[in-house]
Amino acid sequence: MANIRKTHPLLKIINGAVIDLPTPSNISAWWNFGSLLGLCLITQTLTGLFLAMHYTADITLAFSSVAHICRDVNYGWLLRNIHANGASFFFICIYLHIARGLYYGSYLYKETWNIGVLLLLLVMMTAFVGYVLPWGQMSFWGATVITNLLSAFPYIGDTLVQWIWGGFSVDNATLTRFFTFHFLLPFIIMGTTMLHLLFLHETGSNNPTGLDSDADKVTFHPYFSYKDLLGFTILLATLSALALLNPNLLGDPENFTPANPLVTPPHIKPEWYFLFAYAILRSIPNKLGGVLALLFSILILVVVPTLHTSKQRSNTFRPSSQTLFWILVANMLVLTWIGGQPVEHPFIIIGQVASVLYFMLFLFFIPLSGWLENKILDWA
């Protein structure tokens, strides 16, 4: 008699996805981040659900309700600290996951890649509206500055901003709708993640060599299920350490002050995981230009598969493309640093150079490197 997990309508789907799934035998720890992102999503949804039970989406009560959660709710401080720092870990995992895709050429699975870019945009949107909810100074001014950017769009801009605000400034209506979006989006992310996995399992995973691995596949369980479990342990241990020992390390002290429309903070900046995009936005001395640069700093990922010029898929055997990849990583770190600095010399020019280099690497240097490597291979 056949095993129930292979015949039951529901269990056979799970079996095909996480038990008997044929997996390349040589995928490294860089392939752990997909499952870690799933863990982050579950952690964030559960902690967020319990926080939402005690949170009040009203400008007179929001800040107090967060304080109430931390002081009076059983383990409320822990829920809040895990949720706030879990967002940082979510972005660490998502950036490493994308970096893995760029390095090993996983982007050539176009459907999976494009849904991944959509997931990135959804997660960024969720994090942005979530940051507004505690209604501290940086929450309020961050919401004001970022939503105001939409006014740069010709003709419809001002109407669009007022429509999003639900009035003539960031007010109660804005907070209420941001809470609605923050609650709704994770479930949309879950659905999109299912699509991401569906398309991935159509082709199977890529591997570090970038070569076809049909000749050497192993079952996902027990080999990679246990490998993922090790990743889970490391992630949860690190997240727990941060949430328990130094929960405010990555936050902004300004957010411990209740929102005040009459007092502008000296430096308005988003959470650290948005600083690279914020630096690109600020490096262009034109409002619409800055908004478009901000948008394209993420959407440029969509054109990466089209700009793949190399005969080889992965960077494993391509030294010059490897060098450019690590220059891109260093450039991202520089942009992140610049995004947190005041708008003054020499930070302005460093930000502008780094922003130009960011786009040049994607659009020119990396495709050129692939083409040159092909030429060298032809001569060999």
From Swiss-Prot:
Alphabetically ordered keywords of this record: Electron transport, Heme, Iron, Membrane, Metal-binding, Mitochondrion, Mitochondrion inner membrane, Respiratory chain, Transmembrane, Transmembrane helix, Transport, Ubiquinone
Family stated for the protein in its record: Belongs to the cytochrome b family.
Stored Pfam families: Cytochrom_B_C (PF00032), Cytochrome_B (PF00033)
Extra remark beyond the main annotation: Heme 1 (or BL or b562) is low-potential and absorbs at about 562 nm, and heme 2 (or BH or b566) is high-potential and absorbs at about 566 nm.
The protein, known as: Cytochrome b
A molecular function (GO) term: ubiquinol-cytochrome-c reductase activity
Organism: Lepisosteus oculatus (Spotted gar)
Chain positions recorded as a ubiquinone binding sites: 201
Subunit structure: The cytochrome bc1 complex contains 3 respiratory subunits (MT-CYB, CYC1 and UQCRFS1), 2 core proteins (UQCRC1 and UQCRC2) and probably 6 low-molecular weight proteins.
Biological process terms in GO annotation: mitochondrial electron transport, ubiquinol to cytochrome c
Any single GO CC term annotated in Swiss-Prot or TrEMBL for this entry: membrane
Entry membrane topology: Multi-pass membrane protein
